C-alpha cells in the first residue's frame, strides 16, 4: 500500500501486551440449555439444545419427552455424545409434548433443563418451521430491528423490539413518529414499553440501542440516547415533557451537499431543516431490563455543538450515530456511544456499575489532528462498526470503519481509506495469524474500493480499486466461507468476481446476494440470508440455489433486506433468524431442522460473536462473526475464559 494512503501509529502496536490467559475471565450471561422443538412434519419433531462454553468436551446428554405433563420418558437408549440435535418420530401428536435434556457429568445425571415454551409442541399443532411471538404493535408502527438479553436473569433470552413509524433518513427533512421499544418474553408477554419521544428523530442512523448486562448482576440493561420527553417503562418522563425542539417549517439553508437538497430557480442549492432536532439537551439513559425504568441519565457525549462543524448546515451528518459493547477492562463490559463518521468522529465509553453511570474515556478525531481532511482520523467511520480483541490481550478494540481505537480510547491506526457501507472482522484467513478485516469504501479518489487488512496493525494484505463512473461506490461486500476448496472465507462485493481470502479471483460468477449469512444446514460452510430466504452457493455449478423461504414474513430496512435479528439464540450452534410477519403482528423465530454431525459450543459464549449480536441493530446492519475461523477445515474452536453470575432474587 502506498505510504500516502496508510497512516499507522506504530508505537502502541510495539508495546508489550498481556496475554489473555493471564487476565481474569470475562463475565458473561448465564444461559440455560436453550432447548427448542420444531415440528417439521406431521410425525417429526426436531429437538436441539446448547453446548455451553465451559462444558467439558466429553459431556453427554439424555433427552426426555413429557406427554400432557406425564413423567418424562427418556428417548435415547445410550447417552448422546455427538451433535446436540435429535429427531423424534415416536411422539403422540394428539398430546402436548414437552422436551428437556439432562447433562451427564461423571456418570451422574444433572437436573433437567428449564421448561420453556419453545421446547413444547401443543397437541395437534400444525407442522411449521418456526415459533411465534405475538406482538402488541401500535397502529401505524412496524417491528424493525431487535436485540436480545436476559432481562430477568432466568437463563433465557428476552426480545427487545425497536418499533418504527414514520421514519426519515438523515438526508431527508420531515417530521417522524416517536421511536418505541417493547420487551417481550418468548411466550409473547409484554414486559414494558419505552417511548423515546418527539425529540428523538426516527431513522436507521439515529437510535442505536445496546442490550447487555453492563453491571454484572446477571440481568441485562438497555442503554440508548434519550431526550426531553422520553417516557420510561414505568411511565416516568425524562426531562421536560412539554419540550418540542423539532424544526418547524421549511427553514431552508444553503447546502453544498446534493443529498436532501433542492436547487432553487436562481441556481442556489438549499436544504430544508424541517423536522430535524437541532436544539435542546441530549441524554444517555440506562434502563432496567426487568421494568424499563430509567436507572440513570447523563448528558450525551459529544454534544451536537455547532451543526455546521460536522459537515453540513441542515442536520444530516451531525446526527450519524453508532454504538457497541466492548470489554475495555479485565472483566465487565462498557457501552461505546459514537457520533459522526463523514468528518469528525467521537467515541465515548461509559460504565454502568454499582448504580452509577460514569464516563471511562472519549476519543475525538479532532484532538488528533486538524479539523480537515488531512487528519487521518476524520471521515474514516462506516455506517457500522465492529468490536474485537485484535491484539489478543483480553481487551477489546473498536474497529471504526477504516480506523481502529484501542481499549483505552487512544487511536491504534487509520488506513485513511475513508467511509464505507460494510465491515467484516474475524479470522477470515486461517492460514495467517490473528484477525483480519474486510471492508468496502465508496470514495473513488482512494486507491481501494475493497480491502483486506490485518485487524491488529491495519497493514494492507490486499485491495482492489472501486468501480468506475457512473457507479464508483462499492455499495456492498461480504466475507463468508462458501467454498470448501479454498481455505478461509470467500469474498465478494458489487465488483466483478468471487475472491478467495488471498484476493485471487476463483470464479467470474458469484452468489446472487451480497447481504447476510447464516449457519443453517449441517456442514460448516455458511449459507446466504437475504430477505426472507436462505440459499446456498454451489461451488461446482457456480450457482445459488434456494434452501428455505420464510413464508408470510418480510425483512426490514427496504433494499437492505435485513432480518430483525440473526443469531445463535437457541438450540445447537447454528443460527436462528427472526423476521416479522407481513401484517406486523408477530415475530417468527426460524430454526433449522436439518441434521448435523458437528458439535460446537453456543456461539453466544464466543466473546466476539456475542458482542456482534449487541451491535447488529446499529446503522446498516451487518452479520455477526465469531473471533475464530468457523468453516471447512477449521481447527477445534477455542475455549474462551468466561465467568458467570447467579442473579440475586
Regions found by a protein language model. Name each.
Residues 21-29:
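Proline/serine/threonine-rich low-complexity linkers at boundaries of modular beta-sandwich domains
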Residues 1-4:
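Positively charged n-region of N-terminal signal peptides that target proteins for export
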Residues 7-16:
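Bacterial N-terminal signal peptides
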Residues 61-63:
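Short beta-strand elements bearing conserved aromatic residues within extracellular beta-rich modules
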Residues 28-33, 42, 51-56, 66, ...:
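Beta-propeller-forming repeat regions
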Amino acid at each position: 500500500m502506498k505510504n500516502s494512503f496508510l497512516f499507522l501509529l506504530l508505537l502502541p502496536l510495539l508495546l508489550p501486551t498481556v496475554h489473555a490467559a493471564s487476565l481474569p475471565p470475562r463475565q458473561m450471561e448465564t444461559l440455560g440449555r436453550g432447548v427448542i422443538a420444531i415440528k417439521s412434519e406431521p410425525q417429526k419433531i426436531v429437538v436441539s439444545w446448547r453446548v455451553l462454553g465451559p462444558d467439558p468436551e466429553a459431556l453427554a446428554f439424555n433427552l426426555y419427552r413429557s406427554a400432557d405433563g406425564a413423567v418424562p420418558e427418556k428417548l435415547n437408549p445410550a447417552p448422546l455424545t455427538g451433535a446436540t440435535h435429535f429427531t423424534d418420530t415416536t411422539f403422540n401428536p394428539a398430546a402436548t409434548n414437552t422436551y428437556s435434556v439432562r447433562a451427564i457429568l461423571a456418570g451422574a445425571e444433572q437436573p433437567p433443563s428449564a421448561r420453556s415454551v419453545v421446547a413444547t409442541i401443543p397437541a395437534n399443532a400444525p407442522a411449521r418451521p418456526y415459533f411465534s411471538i405475538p406482538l402488541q404493535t401500535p397502529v401505524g408502527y412496524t417491528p424493525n430491528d431487535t436485540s436480545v438479553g436476559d432481562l430477568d436473569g432466568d437463563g433465557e433470552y428476552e426480545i427487545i423490539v425497536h418499533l418504527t413509524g414514520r421514519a426519515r433518513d438523515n438526508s431527508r427533512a420531515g417530521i417522524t413518529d416517536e421511536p418505541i421499544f417493547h420487551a417481550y418474553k418468548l411466550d409473547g408477554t409484554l414486559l414494558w414499553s419505552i417511548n423515546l419521544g418527539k425529540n428523538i428523530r426516527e431513522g436507521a442512523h439515529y437510535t442505536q440501542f445496546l442490550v447487555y448486562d453492563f453491571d454484572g448482576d446477571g440481568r441485562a440493561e438497555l442503554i440508548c440516547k434519550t431526550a426531553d420527553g422520553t417516557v420510561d417503562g414505568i411511565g416516568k418522563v425524562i426531562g421536560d415533557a412539554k419540550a418540542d425542539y423539532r424544526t418547524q417549517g421549511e427553514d431552508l439553508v444553503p447546502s453544498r451537499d446534493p443529498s436532501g437538497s433542492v436547487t432553487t430557480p436562481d441556481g442556489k442549492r438549499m436544504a430544508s431543516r424541517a423536522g430535524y432536532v437541532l436544539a435542546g439537551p441530549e441524554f444517555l439513559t440506562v434502563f432496567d431490563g426487568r421494568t424499563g425504568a430509567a436507572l440513570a441519565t447523563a448528558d450525551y457525549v459529544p454534544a451536537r455543538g455547532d451543526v455546521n462543524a460536522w459537515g453540513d448546515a441542515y442536520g444530516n451528518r451531525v446526527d450519524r450515530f453508532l454504538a457497541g459493547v466492548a470489554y475495555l477492562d479485565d472483566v465487565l463490559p462498557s457501552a461505546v456511544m459514537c457520533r459522526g463518521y463523514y468528518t469528525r468522529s467521537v467515541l465515548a465509553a461509559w460504565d454502568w456499575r454499582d448504580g452509577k453511570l460514569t464516563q471511562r474515556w472519549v476519543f475525538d478525531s479532532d484532538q488528533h489532528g486538524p479539523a480537515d481532511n488531512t487528519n487521518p482520523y476524520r471521515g474514516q467511520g462506516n455506517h457500522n462498526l465492529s468490536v474485537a480483541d485484535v491484539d489478543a490481550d483480553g481487551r477489546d478494540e473498536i474497529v471504526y470503519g477504516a480506523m481502529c481505537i484501542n481499549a483505552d480510547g487512544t487511536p491504534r491506526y487509520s488506513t485513511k481509506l475513508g467511509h464505507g457501507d460494510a465491515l467484516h472482522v474475524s479470522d477470515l484467513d486461517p492460514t495467517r495469524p490473528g484477525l483480519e478485516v474486510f471492508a468496502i469504501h465508496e470514495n473513488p479518489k482512494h486507491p481501494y474500493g475493497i480491502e483486506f487488512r490485518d485487524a491488529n496493525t491495519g497493514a494492507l494484505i490486499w485491495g482492489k480499486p472501486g468501480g468506475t463512473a457512473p457507479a464508483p461506490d462499492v455499495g456492498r461486500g461480504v466475507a463468508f466461507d462458501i467454498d470448501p476448496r479454498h481455505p478461509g472465507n470467500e469474498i465478494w462485493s458489487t465488483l466483478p468476481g468471487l475472491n478467495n481470502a488471498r484476493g485471487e479471483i476463483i470464479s467470474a460468477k458469484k452468489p446472487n446476494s451480497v447481504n447476510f449469512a447464516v449457519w443453517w444446514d449441517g456442514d460448516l460452510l455458511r449459507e446466504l440470508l437475504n430477505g426472507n430466504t436462505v440459499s446456498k452457493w454451489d461451488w461446482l455449478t457456480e450457482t445459488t440455489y434456494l434452501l428455505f423461504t420464510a413464508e408470510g414474513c418480510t425483512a426490514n430496512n427496504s433494499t437492505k433486506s435485513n432480518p430483525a435479528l440473526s443469531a445463535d439464540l437457541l438450540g445447537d450452534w447454528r443460527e436462528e433468524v427472526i423476521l416479522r410477519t407481513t401484517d406486523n403482528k408477530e415475530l417468527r423465530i426460524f430454526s433449522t431442522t436439518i441434521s448435523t454431525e458437528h458439535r460446537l459450543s453456543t456461539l453466544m459464549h464466543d466473546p466476539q460473536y456475542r458482542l456482534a449480536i449487541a451491535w447488529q441493530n446499529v446503522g446498516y446492519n451487518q452479520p455477526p462473526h465469531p473471533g475464530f475461523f468457523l468453516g471447512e477445515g477449521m481447527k477445534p474452536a477455542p475455549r474462551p475464559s468466561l465467568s458467570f453470575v447467579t442473579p440475586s432474587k
